[in-house]
């Protein structure tokens, strides 16, 4: 179980929404090869640690509210157990830990409307929350064998957290939306001694916006810091009339619901062997997904990127897969012209192209032919590239 954090961000929120939990039947994506720093598909169990600051005097109300919702949470697919604890030293500090079969069912739950409705009774009792999410690597329990197969090796990363937000604007307002999102004043990148906003990349396709952020340190802290910046607040307010989903940023519940529905977590990130003199270009790809095929396509792209990370000569320097429901976006840093290597840039090289045919609705973007054909891949790349609006990096990132 988890409770949504206090909503505030450059384009706030944390983590995912409803994803079909396919991990039980799909093979795990290897992560012990170099380069993979994020993977929701490695098959390991997940431990969620939620720290809560409860209003003093409302401890009993909080406990009663938890009692009312605990059975509903226990029935969520993929949920294994949870444990509610109160601090020995400070009665306002509580800890809620939960275990999940894997990341996929947790991400399907944490930012869904169902989750918000379930935990709403707790909200009035809680001043603040902070959520931490971990893959279980090893477990020791009195000599009894631990369930599941542990990952053979830890992932190695660069202390960078990646997250994305997606939303749609009313048809006919795309030009003004693009102008607002291209011209806003950059927020102060420095958050505190351990957290810094590194990069914000915005893209548009039709009336859909995708905003991807990279943070060194704590994501929630950075997003809250950014949300307080006057320039960011001004552009968020200016966007309100154009949004297809109404929101009131002055109403915490309205803001929380908007950013919950907009959250699109990074489910896989791979960095490839860097090359000096590489001509980096960043692009975002919005894949046309058949109904219900989003989870399988995200897993396929993750598997392709994990395999490609072993190739030091490929054109892709880094790739991040963002996923929610049937929305799959892949953020790719490429060395050179992307159209020189469409299969690799799309993540549909080798067997991946044939495997993707049943998952992609290429005709929806005006592309005929099989993804296994080179000409089809070239056309597909041109049609699913999102239009870049802005790509801002902080000094030293």
From Swiss-Prot:
Disulfide bonds: none
Disordered as annotated region, ranges: 1-22
InterPro entries found in the cross-reference section: ABM_dom, Dimeric_a/b-barrel, SchA_CurD-like
Record's compositionally biased regions (Low complexity): 8-22
Residue stretches making up the ABM domain: 46-137
Pfam families (UniProt xref): ABM, SchA_CurD
Sequence similarity: Belongs to the SchA/CurD family.
Name recorded for this polypeptide: 42.8 kDa protein in whiE locus
Provenance organism: Streptomyces coelicolor (strain ATCC BAA-471 / A3(2) / M145)
Lineage: Bacteria, Bacillati, Actinomycetota, Actinomycetes, Kitasatosporales
